[in-house]
Amino acid sequence: MSATSSPTAFLQVATGKPAEHTPVWFMRQAGRSLPEYRAVRGEGSILDAIKQPRLAADITLQPVARYGVDAAVLYSDIVVPAHAVGFGIDVAPGTGPVAEHPFRTVADLQRLRPLDPEADTPYVLETVRMLAAELKVPLLAFAGAPFTVGSYLVEGKPSRDHLITKQMMRDEPELWNALM
């Protein structure tokens, strides 16, 4: 991709207008292959890195600087909200999201509370502020679908078959719906 690519190509296409080229961006997961990512990421969990605004901003900027992509993707993870409200979930290297105590009972509802972004995730807000001041391309963010995040909480780890989740949906639909 050319370093002269239009910073508005993504916004042009997003608003239904033609652009001089198809916009390109680099998902966070792909960023793991960048040598500069491996150099700055260091040890510790991804959540540790996300909680450091300068580091998270720098990682977000890496594909933009290297490839001149048309949008940046916020360095984050779909479990940040559950972790931020104290659920006890982390991202284990080579495994993915792992819950300390999976969500299985009505009592587990007490472990969840509404997210207050300013109180619970000030590091995300600060990262976004930094990026808004530095980026010349749009900033994209992502979120996990309720089923995906809910399944991580219920299963306690990544699952291909979601048996515990399906059992809860079938046997305890009120509990499942409350989680959703």
Predicted regions and their residues:
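N-terminal basic, low-complexity leaders that serve as flexible interaction/assembly modules and, when applicable
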Residues: 1-93
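Active-site-proximal, glycine-rich beta->alpha crossover segments in alpha/beta enzymes
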Residues: 90-180
